[in-house]
């Protein structure tokens, strides 16, 4: 069956190459620049580009604000997060901006317009208050009712299923949802936004300022409504009751998206009142949301840290197109590096741990908090005390909130820093929150990656917490472990922990040469290209080193960091954890999830209990977590 007209975008097959369509406008600006010998500041072609950029930034501003959960968590209308399904559905949310820019370009380039200056004011006329008055009048008397009745029509069969249903695909709105729609809906919005401008221009009172002001104010209010965060105090409506019929709120719009049979207005609820479609719960719910009654304490917390400056921008409140895919050094982020560097200095001086993202698993709220410290800072001796204080504050805060389990990420559980979390458990024996380093499951993931026919392995980082557990586990399986360490004392201490009949399988080596015939390398310490050359062709590098080693050898294979895929029934997950694929989390994160799901009452800190490796692994599989 053929798709209904104006239900799909003509440039859908172009993907990101759709932005080439802006080329004609860019070329016109460049041509005028060449002819004038200077920037064409009085060019409508230039204004089209500037307006497009300003509009995109408006939506991005509200999107970023709405996803700064450390600011907005308590005032979110729908507390759930956006999932990958919604991210993909709204990927081309800016199609309407492209459409309206092309319509504007057609208008500017029209011979009739160029000849008669129809609709286009003099560029010297930057401001005319009469134009603003006319535009406001036309917005209230024409644009608002036009949108209201068209919107109601789109909610009737068959228009809803053919055109508008996709816009209602999710109950969690974001400013990007505002732009997501079919060409028909976008053309309708173009008419709605254009009527006040056209009226003012035809009456000879248009201005450049009116174009920018009207369009950007329209986008600002639309983004605000879709932000899913209450920003207007209920006291304002109590002081001026009439105002509730003149401006909508995010709660007002959210009710429309969830219930679909009320609150159809553009910005002014008075049209719902006149049309009999006003949801009278709107302002009571708005008050509850603004006062934080919609807030919920998490059940599980994963306490992460920032890796580096580029990775600091891989968060849900920067660019969703980046944070919803595995981390990479996207070129679009490079211009913002100085800004990110400034924020690093600011966080070093005066920040505390903050909420980054959340998801739900089987009705329980899981959150990721971040310690405001970067990877390099963990190796500065003078910073050790401050980092531990940040981690301790996070643990105590979680304890007060009633969190059941808090899992420590990567460097937050460094042995030299806090003994794998033992520092906090010993200092606060009365903790109700269970502190978990997650390394038991990390060890299990690494061990279960090793083929069953392997007879010997080469282990770097051999005397670390993970290295010790891996060595002791493998020797019980009668697998010879070449443990790279210069410390005979630390090696012998680990060897004595093994049962007497298996101690012979633990072998100390101090150089890489003994491993040149071993094709299974377990990497717990960084390997340089020179050190990797000792591995024979066909070697597989299993990794538990942060950051992971760089794969220089083309004749070898490189494993990723230990990770597990969350169960299929996870909800509201729309953020990739660092370099992990969608739906995949680091094994230490997954270890905390398993600890919570099992309801275990013990802290998992300090040395890894080798006897629990298989127990934790089986529990993870039982709950639906799978190897990534």
UniProtKB/Swiss-Prot annotation:
It catalyses: a long-chain fatty aldehyde + 2 NADPH + O2 + H(+) = a long-chain alkane + formate + 2 NADP(+) + H2O. The chain crosses the membrane at residues 37-57, 131-151, 191-211, 299-319, 331-351. It is an enzyme of class 4 (lyase). InterPro entries: CER1-like_C (IPR021940), Fatty_acid_hydroxylase (IPR006694), NAD(P)-bd_dom_sf (IPR036291), Sterol_Desaturase_Related (IPR050307). It is a multi-pass membrane protein. Aldehyde decarbonylase involved in the conversion of aldehydes to alkanes. Core component of a very-long-chain alkane synthesis complex. Homodimer. This is Very-long-chain aldehyde decarbonylase GL1-2. It comes from Oryza sativa subsp. indica.
